[in-house]
Regions:
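ADP-ribose/adenylate-binding Rossmann-like module
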Residues: 176-187, 317-357
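Rossmann-like NAD(P)-binding element
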Residues: 156-159, 163, 286-340
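Adenosine-phosphate binding glycine-rich loop
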Residues: 37, 49-62, 78-82, 90, ...
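Glycine/serine-rich phosphate-binding loop and adjoining beta1-alpha1 elements at the start
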Residues: 37-78, 112-116, 122-243, 435
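Short internal beta-strands
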Residues: 106-117, 269-271
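Glycine-rich phosphate/diphosphate-binding loop of Rossmann-like nucleotide-binding domains
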Residues: 87-104, 226, 230-297, 303-305
Length: 443
């Protein structure tokens, strides 16, 4: 049974309730006139010590974020503000939430993907007084309930990861009446925001974190590249050297995945729809061909696009027996899992995190992490130091929104001064000096 926390006056009470009852508790009248409010919903509050150990570990290495906490504590921009976060809920994101809380804000958080929720980390946040609504493997209906729970208190700023909170705020404008802006983390989310802006539907200012150089050059490329292969190797216990890897998409994420696969000794094939990226990948030393031609050749297929059903059943039917399918784009719809399930004669769990599908021709196809984000659903996510950069950008942009006059609706880039501040802070904590103009040395 999940653990539910309630506030009543100054006290917090934890109760274990049947799961089906938890979603009737967002607003309860107690004795007719006293409102009882749900503070958190996690799988098991007793997991908190395990989660706290993980948070304490990443805190040691998120040195840029720690420096910015000290910097932003001076002007009290975060004090008495309400901040909502919808982001993959694991130790590094939890530490961001706690930094925001330490700066004086009240924090609500849920996971942007139910398969990426780490229940022990959610429990640790609840113990710290963060309003967390997240359970690993929750249904889509439950996920939508969690989204409502983090915005019903009308936040001043939002951190989004994929655009789902932004969509909800537009369906319920009253939730956004205090909103000064949104910080969007991902390629997928920024694309959704730009479409809304082009259609004239975007009501709020939004900063596209993903378009900052301090984000895509490091998080998207090096972070995803390393974490994707760490997860694939952990899940499969297979050797990568000598395998043929098909990377679907050659944006910054695809570049990182292909680069790390090459470094591990794999032969890499890239598939693309963008002619410039296709030529770039060829110049980088990779074979380039359509997915259908690559399908019979690949041992491991990794989708990196953020687009729906890029790896379809007609591709999967051409694959060799023993092929592995993994997704490291944002959502869990890049691989046509529904089509695979309908077509396969038989499906079973082959190993934790791996499903085996027996195709009509007898071939075995292996799906990793249910088609969700393999690096998070099947691993620990990006390296700590990489997310230190990305979350420093988030914190810097939240501070910018809270300390500035409200911007007009639209999609804004990360201000250059914030982007540069973050990367210079990283150079400082790593003890790296660089040349300035003339004889100046910057350290």
């Amino acid at each position: 049974m999940p653990s539910v926390g309630f506030s009543f006056g100054e006290s917090i009470y934890n109760r274990n309730l049947p799961k089906e009852d938890c979603f009737n508790l967002l607003e309860i009248n107690f004795k007719g006139d006293i409102k009882l409010t749900q503070d958190f919903l996690v799988k098991d509050i007793n997991l908190a010590p395990e989660g706290q150990l993980k948070i304490d570990w990443v805190a040691k290495w998120m040195k840029v974020l720690n420096r910015l906490q000290k910097k932003f504590s001076i002007d009290n921009s975060f004090k008495n503000k309400r901040v909502a976060l919808c982001i993959h809920l694991e130790a590094k994101t939890a530490y961001l939430a706690l930094i925001i809380q330490k700066l004086g804000s009240e924090v609500w958080i849920t996971s942007s993907n139910t398969l990426s929720t780490k229940d022990e980390v959610a429990a640790a946040l609840a113990k710290k007084g963060v309003h967390v609504f997240a359970i690993h493997g929750a249904s889509q209906q439950e996920y939508r309930s969690y989204l409502r729970s983090i915005v019903e208190n009308k936040p001043h700023v939002v951190v989004d990861d994929g655009g789902d909170v932004c969509e909800l705020l537009h369906r319920h404008p009253d939730y956004g009446e205090n909103l000064k802006g949104i910080c969007e983390e991902t390629t997928t989310g920024v694309a959704r925001l730009k479409l809304m802006a082009e259609d004239g539907r975007l009501r709020y200012p939004a900063i596209g974190i993903n378009d900052a150089k301090s984000k895509y050059l490091f998080d998207n490329r090096y972070g995803t590249g390393q974490s994707t292969w760490t997860a694939i190797m952990h899940l499969t216990n297979m050797n990568i050297a000598g395998k043929t890897v098909v990377v679907i998409g050659y944006g910054w994420v695809g570049r990182g995945v292909a680069l790390r696969a090459k470094g591990l000794g794999a032969e890499v094939i890239v598939t693309e729809i963008d002619p410039w990226k296709a030529l770039e990948s060829r110049m980088d030393g990779f074979k380039v061909m359509p997915i259908l031609k690559a399908a019979p050749l690949g041992d491991i297929f990794v989708t990196t696009t953020g687009l729906e059903n890029v790896l379809r059943i007609e591709h999967i039917e051409q694959m060799k027996s023993g092929a592995f399918l993994a997704n490291t784009g944002h959502f869990d719809f890049e691989i046509d899992v529904k089509g695979l399930s309908r077509t396969a004669h038989y499906m079973k769990e082959a190993r934790e995190g791996i499903e085996e599908f027996t195709m009509p021709n007898g071939n075995k196809i292996y799906l990793l992490a249910q088609g969700g984000l393999v690096n998070i659903a099947g691993g620990l996510g990006h390296p700590v130091e990489i997310m230190d950069l990305s979350f420093a950008l988030q914190l810097g942009c939240l501070h910018y929104l809270l300390s500035s006059e409200k911007l007009a609706p639209g999609v804004y880039p990360v201000p250059d001064e914030i982007d540069e501040m973050v990367v210079r802070e990283k150079l400082k904590v790593d003890g790296i000096e660089i040349d300035g103009f003339g004889k100046e040395v910057i350290g």
